Structures are given as C-alpha cells and as structure tokens.
Swiss-Prot record:
Lineage: Eukaryota, Metazoa, Chordata, Craniata, Vertebrata
Reaction catalyzed: L-cysteine(in) = L-cysteine(out)
Record-linked SUPFAM superfamilies: MFS general substrate transporter
Domain of life: Eukaryota
Record's keyword terms, sorted: Acetylation, Amino-acid transport, Lysosome, Melanin biosynthesis, Membrane, Transmembrane, Transmembrane helix, Transport
Protein name, as recorded: Major facilitator superfamily domain-containing protein 12
Family affiliation: Belongs to the major facilitator superfamily.
The species this protein was found in: Canis lupus familiaris
Example of a GO cellular component annotation carried by this entry: melanosome membrane
Gene3D superfamilies given in the database record: MFS general substrate transporter like domains
Cytoplasmic face residues: 1-26, 78-97, 146-170, 238-286, 330-338, 383-400, 466-478
Compartment list: Melanosome membrane; Lysosome membrane
Amino acid sequence: MGPGPPAAGAAAPPRPLSLSARLSYAVGHFLNDLCASMWFTYLLLYLHSVRAYSSRGAGLLLLLGHVADGLCTPLVGYEADRAAGRCVRCGPRKAWHLVGTVCVLLSFPFIFSPCLGCGPATPEWAALLYYGPFIVIFQFGWAATQIAHLSLIPELATNDHEKVELTALRYAFTVVANITVYAAAWFLLHLQGSPNVEMARDASDQLGIQDVQVFQNLSLLVIGVGAVFSLLFHLGTREGRRPQVEEPDENRPLLAPTTARPLLLWRHWLREPAFYQVGLLYMSTRLIVNLSQTYIAMYLTYSLSLPKKFIATIPLVMYLSGFCSSFLMKPVNKCIGRNLTYFTGLLVILAFAAWVALADRLGMAVYAAAVLLGSGCATILVTSLAMTADLIGPHTHSGAFVYGAMSFSDKVANGLAVMAIQSLYPCSLEICCRACMGFYRWVMVAATGGVGVAATLCLCSLLIWPIRLRSWDPGAQP
C-alpha cells in the first residue's frame, strides 16, 4: 500500500522562490550600496580637497555619520520587529525599507552639493552645521533600508541553501554597485579634464573647487539609478504576512488551548551565547572587509609607490573577483558546509596577508594579490550573513533586532579601529614621509591577517558549540 493522502490540517510545503523573486530581492539594497561606495571612498576627499574644509572638520562630519548610523541601526531593528503589518500595501519590513529609501533619496544629494546660502566669507563651522542634518537623515535612512532588507532573508528563504543564495546575490549586486560608482567617477573626471594633454597631466590629477560639479553629478546619478532598482524591489518582492490574532466572541471559550509558538523577544537574545558567538564572527568579518577597503589605496600609493591608475584598477579587480566567487557560495556551502566555507575564505585572506608581509615590492603581482583579497572577503562576508540567518531561524519576528545589533557592533568596532590606526600614524605632516611607507603595509597585514586570526578563533568556538539556542525555554513565561 502506498502512503495515504496528507492530513487535512497538514500545511503544504513552502514553494521555493522564483528567479524573478530572488533577483527582485537582491536589488533592494542597490541604492544603499551605491551611496555607501561613494560615502566611504569620496566623502573625505570631497570635503577636504574639493570644498577645502579642514581635515578636522571633514573628520567630524564622517564621525557624525558613524555615530548616527551606530545609534539608528539597533533602534530601527527593534522598531521593525515591533511592527505588526500595519502597512496595508506591504509588510512591516518593506514599509521600513520604503521609509529608509525616501530618506536616502531626499538627503544624499545635498551632502555632495555646495552649501546653499554659503559664500566665501561663511565660517567653516556654519557650513558643517548645514551638512550635519542631511548626514543624520541619510544615515537613518541607510540603516532602516539595510536592516529591513537583511531581516527579509529569513522571511523569504524556505531552506538553508536559499539563504546562502539570497546573500550571495545580494553581495553580487553590492559588487556591481561599487563598480558602477568607480566607473562613473572615472568617466565624469575624464570629461572634466583639459583637452590639452600636458595641462591635463598637471591639472586633472589635482582635485579642487572646479570638481564640485563632478561630485554633484555623480551623487545625482547614484540617486537616479538607485531609485529605479528600489522600485523594482518593491514591485517584485512579497513579504509574508503574519497571522492576525482573532478577536474572541461570546461563543468561544475564554480558556482556549494555546497552540501558537512562543515568541523569542529581543531580551531573550541577550541571554543566548550563540548570539555573541555569531556577533563576534560578523564583527571580525566586517573589520577585515572594511579596513582592507579603506586602506588599500594608501597601501598602493605610499607603500608600493604605484601610479595613480592602480587606485582604480586594483579595487576593480577586487570587486570583480568577489563578484565571481559570490556565485560559487551556494554549491560550495552545499558540499562542505558553512564552517568549512568560511574557513576556506579565511585561508585565502591569510595567504594575502602573508604575501604582503613577506614581499616588499609586489610589482604586477599585486593583481594576483587583489584577486586573493577580493575573493576571500566575498566568501567570509556571504557566509557570515548566512550564519546570522541560521541563528535567527524561524524567529523572524525578532530578526531585525539581531541584524541591528550585529551592525551596531560592526560600526563601533570599525570606528574604533580607524581611530586607533590614525593615532599610530608616524608622520606629523599631511605629506607622506619615509616612515609611513612601511606603516600602511603593516596596516594591511594587521587588518587582514591579525583580524583573520581573531575570526579563526571565533569560528573554532562555533565548531565546539554550534549555532543553536541554549538558554531560551519556550515554555517559560516572557
């Protein structure tokens, strides 16, 4: 006899996401990625070299952005979890994504535009006060979009392999966003150059007030392209609705049997060891990725003394290698599992760190080193996001808080790390001296190899104590 028909009350197995649904989700963070690439790469350069603000003033605006982002991220995550589908047209995650997108669209162009009403006699502090509110609004919107988009992964994915695929596609579009920004910046600066070749060699390499229009046009291009992809996300992504609690009537018993799954609240996460294990691993991953991205240009320029074209070509090679490796995440995770996949990425990054430490001059081999760094960073970033989704599991109602807490630790750790590195800078002048030539080399070694060792220790803890909830008792009272 064959198996009987399914029980009447049995739930149908969830249908896997279609290709269009996966791609629609993946482009939902494209606007954030475009803005983040321009923010991290060009903000200090724009404020200091183009707008001629002091290094301290430009640094204060960047610090304000990090503080605002760090504070808004967990708060947005907590509020997103509290939302109970009040939006009629979309779910609570997409509603927060829409709010964040609007804030980014309205504020980001003003950050890379001249101060309205400011003149040559306007004091610097007044101009900084002008930019401050736009930066805070932008960082709030960026955090809301990021947390809402990340917390949709456990909601949409029906199995572990779909989680990896969604994070891999998300990272692939992050790479495309970075390539788009760098290519557009090169094109706009090329158009700004002088038709006289000899004059271009002297003038086009120096940024100044004449390049204000370049950055303003670049920010408008970023906003326009990002808005189109955000619209595609909202049109093609459907968030699952949470069942509403039915109102009791006079014919229903007051003491009905309880069948609903107990909720895992944010305060329960704080008592879970796995929450801190995955948090430390995610923080270490972000330190490797962000610090290497921040200091790779300094390393190429001052430690290796390479021409300026390498500042554009090497990051491009890094992102292209990361783009290609991101598509291998699903089959690799399926074959060897999360932990070994992450460890493989760490081995590639440690190989890059050893190469940089042992070789004074890389020459053209720097392209091969860039491939190692880009593919390794993509591997550990995608896998760490998949591990975070594993930690959340079916408890998607508090997933935004988990992602918010992870991002908060990431922002704080990166800010403190950059401050520590800058405080150790050996040159008292802005012009690089002989002492700083080796300084940036060892910064790259520490940012990749040193933090990579710390990430290895975090991974070992997950091998000993796998990702699962240990302290939460579903039968206990909240």
